[in-house]
Amino acid sequence: MQERYQPNSVEAAAQQTWQARDAYLVHEHAKNPDGSEKPKFYACSMLPYPSGKLHMGHVRNYTINDMMARQLRMRGYNVLMPMGWDAFGMPAENAAIKSKVPPAKWTYDNIAYMKKQMKAMGLAIDWSREMCACDPKYYKWNQWLFLKMLEKGIAYRKTQVVNWDPVDQTVLANEQVIDGRGWRSGAPVEKREIPGYYLRITDYAEELLDQVSTNLPGWPERVRLMQENWIGKSEGLRFAFPHRIAGADGKLIQDGKLYVFTTRADTIMGVTFCAVAPEHPLATHAAQSNPALAAFVEQCKLGGTTEAEMATREKEGMPTGLTVTHPLTGAEIDVWVGNYVLMTYGDGAVMGVPAHDERDFAFARKYGLPIRQVVALEGKTYSTDAWQEWYGDKQAGRTVNSGKYDGLAYQAAVDAIAADLAAQGVGEKQTTWRLRDWGISRQRYWGTPIPIIHCADCGPVPVPEQDLPVVLPDDLIPDGSGNPLAKNEAFLSCSCPRCGKPARRETDTMDTFVDSSWYFMRYTSPDNDQAMVDARNDYWMPMDQYIGGIEHAVLHLLYARFWTKVMRDLGLLNFDEPFTKLLCQGMVLNHIYSRKTPQGGIEYFWPEEVDNVYDAKGAIVGAKLQRDGSEVNYGGVGTMSKSKNNGVDPQSLIDTLGADTARLFVMFASPPEQTLEWSDSGVEGANRFLRRLWALGYAQREAVGRGLATGADWAQAPAPVKELRREVYGLLKQADYDYQRIQYNTVVSACMKMLNAIDDAPLPEGPAADAARAETLGLLLRVLYPVVPHITWHLWQDLGYAEHLGDLLDAPWPHVDEAALVADEIELMLQVNGKLRGSIRVAAKAPKEDIERIAAAQEEVARFLEGRPPKRVIVVPGKLVNVVG
C-alpha cells in the first residue's frame, strides 16, 4: 500500500477493474444467492445535451444519482442507472455554421469527450443501454409513434399563428418563448401564420391535471403547482355579443356573433368594451379600411404569443370603429384591437369589465373608456381613481347596477345570467384550459424528420411503416439561411406511396422535446429493432426516481407525461405516469465579477483573476484585478455560466485533485435540492478529508489486518473499545436514515464524524482494539463508498477487507449492531443547589441509591456545600443529579 494518497493512480486502478469486470451491467429479474428475486429500482438523471464538456451542474446531478444507485445496490436492489444523449437541436446547427463541419460530427465528437468525462467520474452507468437521439435506430420510433398518432387523430396538421424566431428561422412552442424572446437565440419573437403538425395534448388535459394533483406525492409541491397552473383549468361561461358586421362577401362575419369566455359571469353587466386579437376576423375586416389600424395590427405581430409574455407587455389597443350588442342590455359595445389578446386562447376575444379586472381597469384608464361598477362589498368605497384589490373579491360581493340581477351573491348571479343567455341561445357554461396543443414542426435541419410525403395529387401522405426510418442526411453543413433539407434534392425527391408519382418529402423536423419525451423507456429495451419498447419496459417502469432541474417542470416533464399516456392508449404500456418520484437538484452558483467596457458593454472576469475586498464583517464588497489592481464590480453569486466567466471546469478539478474530491464537495456543500455555492476552500477541505482517510488506513493497516483475522468478544471488550463502537454505530444509524431521505450532505457529515472518532479513539493495544479498528474503519468505508467510490474501493482492497469480506462492489449495506449502542456507563450532569458543577459516570443500570451516594461523595459537592451534609439528592434518570444542601 502506498503511503500517500495519489488520486490519479487510485481512480485509474479502480475504473480499470470495474470496466474489466463489467461491474454495472444490469439484467432484468436479477436474483439473490438464495434464488429470490431482487426488488428493482430505476434511478435516472435527465439526459444531457452534448454541448462539448460537462459542467459542475452535471457533476452534481450525476453524483446524486450515482450515490443513490450504489447505496441501493448495497441494500439488495437491482438498480438501473443508464445514460444517453439529447443530441438533436439548434446548438449543433449553430456550431456547424461556425466551424463549417456537419452537426453530426460536432455532436459525436462531443459525446465521445463527455462520455470519457463521465467514466472519469466513476459513475455506475450501464453503458450497454446508451441511446442517442440523433441515431436513426432511436428516432425511427419517434416517426413510428407519430404515424400511430396520425392514425388515431392525436397528430394533425393545421395552419395557426405561431411564435417565429427570426434568427433560428423556426417555430417555437409557447414554453420556449422567454420574456418575448427565443429561448436559445434571445431574438425578439414574431407572430406568423404557418402550417405545421400538432399533437392533441389538450385531449389529455383533464387526466394530466387530475393525476398531477392527486397521484404524484413523490414530486415537489412547486413542480406540481407549476404544471397545474400551466394546464390551467377554468370553469366559466362562453357567450356571444351579437352584431350585424358583414364581410366583403356580404355575409355576417362569424355568423354575427363575437364569442368570449369569462370566469366572472356575475360582472357581465359591467362590460364597457370588447377587445379582439390582432388576427381576429373583425380586426382584419376593420384594418382593410383603416391604415392606422392595419399598421397597429402589424406591430402587434412582433413578440411572443404566451400568456407570460402578454402579462409583462405594456397593454396597448386601438378602436376598430365597430360595435357589437350587449346580449342582456342591448347597449352598443365598442370593439378594440388589443395587443394583449391571444387568438390561440378561447375565441381570440375578451370582454372588458374595467371595474372588476385589473388589466381592463388599466386599459380603460389609459384610453378613457367607461368604468361601470357592478359588484359592491359592504364597507368598501368604490372609486375609479385607482385599482383596489377588493374589486376582484367574488365571494364577498353582491351585484349592483345590474338591473334584475341586483343583490345577488357570486354563484347566484352566475347561474341566473348563464340561464338567461342560454335561453337566448347565445351562451353556455364551459370549461376552458390554458394548455394548448403541442406544435412539433420545426423549420430546422438537425432533428427527427417528420415522416410525411407531399404529393401534388394526393396531398400529405404518411410514409409507410416499412420505409421507416426516414433517415436524416448527416453530412449537410448549414449556412444559416434556413433549413438545408429544403435545398437537398437527394433528401427531397421521392415517390408518392399512394399513387407512385414524383413527390417531395416534408422538410420540417420534430421539436427536440419529442426526443426527450420517452428516451427513459428506450433505456429498458435498447437493442429491440422490432418494437419501440418490450416487456423489459414493464419490468423497469414506472421510473422510481427521476433527477433533474426545476427548469424542466413545464416543458419536458409535461410532455413526457403526455407521451406516456399516448403510448398507454396505444397498448404499449400498462401504467399512467412515468416518474414515481422527482428530485430537482439546486443550481451550482459562483461569484460574478464584471465592469463596463468603454463601448458600453459588460466584461466579465474569472474569480481566479481577482482579489476580493472585504468589509469589517468579512463580507465581499468589491474586487480588484490581480494584474493591475483596477477595480471591478462584485455582483454576488449566480448560476455558473460560460458567458459570465464564473464556471468551474470539472475536468481540471478531476485532473488535479481527483473525481472523488469533486464528488465529495458537491455532496457535502449543500442539501441536494438547494443551491450550491462554489467554494475553493470547500474543495480543498474535501481533498484534505480524503488525504486524512488514506493516512488513517495506512497508519492502521497492520492493526486492521490483525483485527480482520482474529475478531473479538465485544461483551468483554475494554470500555474505550465499547465507546468507539457505540459512537460509530450511532453515526451509521444517522447516515442510514439520511440516505433514505436523500439528505446526502448530512451523510457526508456523519462520515467525517466517524473518521474523527476512529482517529481520536484512545484504544489500548490488544486484539479487541485491533478488531474495533477493523470493524469501524470497514463501516466507514462502506458508508462512504457511494460518495467516493474510488478511494474507498482501493482502501478496501489494500487493507485486506476484500480477502475476508469480498469486493466492496458486492458488499451489503451494514446493519446497526443495536447491542453496541447500549452503554455500560452513562454520564450525568452534576448540580449543586441547581447550578452545574461537573459530571459523574455511573453504571447504566445503577439504582437510585447508588447514584445518590456517588454524587454526594464528589469533591465538588463538599466544596460548594462547605462541609454541610446534603439535605436531599434529586435524580433525573439518564440526565442529571442535583444535590441540595
From Swiss-Prot:
Catalytic activity field: tRNA(Leu) + L-leucine + ATP = L-leucyl-tRNA(Leu) + AMP + diphosphate
Cross-referenced SUPFAM superfamilies: Anticodon-binding domain of a subclass of class I aminoacyl-tRNA synthetases (SSF47323), Nucleotidylyl transferase (SSF52374), ValRS/IleRS/LeuRS editing domain (SSF50677)
UniProt-annotated location(s): Cytoplasm
InterPro entries the UniProt entry points to: aa-tRNA-synth_I_CS, aa-tRNA-synth_Ia, Leu-tRNA-ligase, Leu_tRNA-synth_edit, M/V/L/I-tRNA-synth_anticd-bd, Methionyl/Leucyl_tRNA_Synth, Rossmann-like_a/b/a_fold, tRNAsynth_Ia_anticodon-bd
Binding site for ATP: K642
Motif, 'HIGH' region: chain positions: 48-58
Any single Gene Ontology cellular-component annotation: cytosol
EC number, as in UniProt: 6.1.1.4
GO biological process, any: leucyl-tRNA aminoacylation
Keywords from the UniProt entry: Aminoacyl-tRNA synthetase, ATP-binding, Cytoplasm, Ligase, Nucleotide-binding, Protein biosynthesis
Domain of life (superkingdom): Bacteria
Acetylation found in the keyword field: no
Short motif 'KMSKS' region, span: 639-643
Main location: cytoplasm
Family stated for the protein in its record: Belongs to the class-I aminoacyl-tRNA synthetase family.
Name by which UniProt lists this protein: Leucine--tRNA ligase
